[in-house]
Every structure is written in structure tokens, then in C-alpha cells.
Amino acid sequence: MTFKIHNRPETKTIQTFDIPESQVLTLSSGHQVHLSNPCNIGVVRVELFWASGSYHQEKPYVATMANDLLLSGNEHRTEFEVIEYLDYLGATHRTECGHVGSSVVIRASKKNILSVFKWFIENVHAATYPENEVESAKLVRAASLERQQKTPKYWSSRIALESLYGKDHTLGIHGDPIDYQKVTSENLNLFKKQHFGLEKMMLLVSGDSDDQLLHSFADALLPFPGTPLSIIQEQFTETFPQFEKPLMHPVDGTNQVNLHLAKHIKPKDQQERFGLTLLNLVLGGYF
């Protein structure tokens, strides 16, 4: 079948969404809040954010495990009891740990969000990383990493980062399953004390929020007076010493990250490119 030129789909210019800027407020407790445009949907999303991540760890996986196991229990409650009450309130949560930032995101109905928030604050503050929970997490994560290391996807990503940044660079370094066995409950408690204190976080709030809810959050945080976040100009310049700020390339409708990588990755010679292409075809066809 032959398509005429006038039947080809039209190319459309990519346009950004017209989203209102978030408000930046400071609660009476001293904590900074980034508040998105409120909307009447009956659900509230709250993100507890710390300006600390894998950049600050001294051992592999300490930051990730310290963040993921914040609700693993304490001297008064087990992990099951902590999560059971969240389920009762109909709340969901997830954790994220990046290079220079970590967060816990909670979602709940507006009528329950304050109870959920107080429960989170109480249990995050009291978290002690029980030995049994830490050991279970280490076994599961080490087994998961072993499975990942049997795939070409893992190794292509790892080799690319190690080649781009260097094996000893914070963005290029990778751990192995055996490194999980070196993480202890003491390591996690120390990292939490240094980096995940409630006084060191800020909040990002979206959904069905209002002034009364923010005042209630502030009251819950009064025992932990907020301090300014130490975000990371020094860390950024150390990570990318050749740049004082991110570069933007004037090409419309493109991914700036991909452009940056394409500009700075050393090109391969023809023979090496052919070998990599052949390897990719073989592995891609096999897996």
C-alpha cells in the first residue's frame, strides 16, 4: 500500500502544561512547605523530603535501606502494627532515595490525612531499625540484586555509568550483593540520626489541602523545630565540577538530559560500535 505525502501525520509542536507555580510557605514550626494549587478531590498527598541521599553514605545501600525501613518498627511497635494502622486508615505510602534527596510520600483521604501524618511523624521519629527487619531486608535485596545481575539491562546501565563518571565517582559506583551483608542496624540508626531528623525535612503538599490542615501539620511538628535545609550547591559542583549550573541546549522538542549525555559521552570508533551493535542484537534476541 502506498501512502501519499498529504496522508502523512502532521508534526505537532510539543507544548508544556500551564500549571500554576507552587507556593512556598513556612509553618509556625519552622518547616518549609511547598504547596501545590489546592483542588477539591477529597485526597491529600504529603511528601516528607530530606536533602540527603546516597551522596552522604559511607557504605553502599545504607541511605536506601535507612529510608525504606523508616517504618520497620521501634521499641514499642512492630512493622506489622505500624502498617496495619495505616491500612485501617486507608493510606498508602512509598519511599524514594536518590543521590542528594530522600522522601516518604503518603496519600490518604482528607478526613484521615492528619491522623496518618501524626502516625508517620511518631513512628519515623521512634524508628530503631530492629535487627530481624534489617536482616530480612538484606536477604530480599541481595537476592533481587543477584537476579538483576543476570540481565544485560543491569550491566549495560552499570558499564555506561562507570564509563561516564568513573567507578569511584558517587554517580558511577555500584554495590554488589555481598555489600548488603556489611550493613548493620547501627549504620542505619546513625544515618537516620545524622540525616533523617524531623527537624531537617520539608513538606510538599498537594491535593485537597487548606490553611486549617497546614496549621494542624505545624502543631504536630512543634516538638521538632525546623531548620533550613542545607541544599547542595557544594554537592552539585562536586558531582559536576565542570559546570557551575546545568546547561540547556537550544533544540526544541528534545530531552535535555539525553542531549547533555550525547554531547559529553566520548564517541566510539567504527569497529567498537559495530561490536557493541552485534552484542546488543545477540543479547536482545536471546533475552
Give the label of every model feature segment.
Residues 17-19, 27-28, 96-100, 251-253:
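Short, ordered beta-strand-loop transition motifs
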Residues 17-19, 87, 243:
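Residues that act as N-cap/strand-start positions at coil-to-secondary-structure junctions
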Residues 31-54, 59-60, 228-287:
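His/Glu-based metal-binding/catalytic segments typifying zinc-dependent metallopeptidases
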Residues 1-7, 26, 37, 81-232, ...:
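Charge-rich, well-structured scaffold segments of protease-associated domains
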Residues 22, 43-45, 101-103, 200, ...:
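Broad gene-expression machinery/nucleic-acid interaction feature
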Residues 2-44:
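N- or domain-start disorder-to-order transition segments that initiate the globular core
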Residues 45-107, 150, 282-286:
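M16/MPP (pitrilysin/insulinase) zinc-metallopeptidase core fold and M16-derived inactive scaffolds
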Residues 11, 22, 33, 91-95, ...:
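Generic structural motif
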